[in-house]
């Protein structure tokens, strides 16, 4: 079954940047999501909000991209009390997934309306199969690095993705 990719929207406030995720956030959207987060991070916003009121579910690739951003903004040894990334209006299923993967500590979670902000339409890319595979591999590796208990969950997935990526690289174009 082909699940449509989530819709991503950028909202900018005075001191914060927000990415609103609508639909099922999966590997197909992960490259665009990572690109958006990287670009927003380069602009040095003091606070980031991921608005999830209309996000029904996230797969492990999307969660891994989110966790990698959380680890980058709140690195080990930093004041995690600051928690510069807020997950707003996440449903119980999403919070449970983040808890089970051992990455919830990287984020502040809350409910409620966003402050006034301006909507920006992101320029989305059309990632190749290789780019999607690489993003998925990196996302799962991050989940295993952050929480070693995830190694048993994702070791076979990462092995398969790494092998698949090597096959793609070795094929002549």
Residue ranges with predicted function:
Residues 4-35:
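STAS-typified acidic loop motif
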Residues 20-23, 53, 122:
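Short, flexible active-site loop motifs that bind/organize anionic cofactors or intermediates
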Residues 27-107:
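Amphipathic alpha-helical interaction surfaces in cytosolic regulatory modules
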Residues 107-116:
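Short acidic-hydrophobic, aromatic-tinged amphipathic segments that line or gate anion-handling sites
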Residues 116-168:
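Charged/polar low-complexity intrinsically disordered segments, enriched in acidic residues
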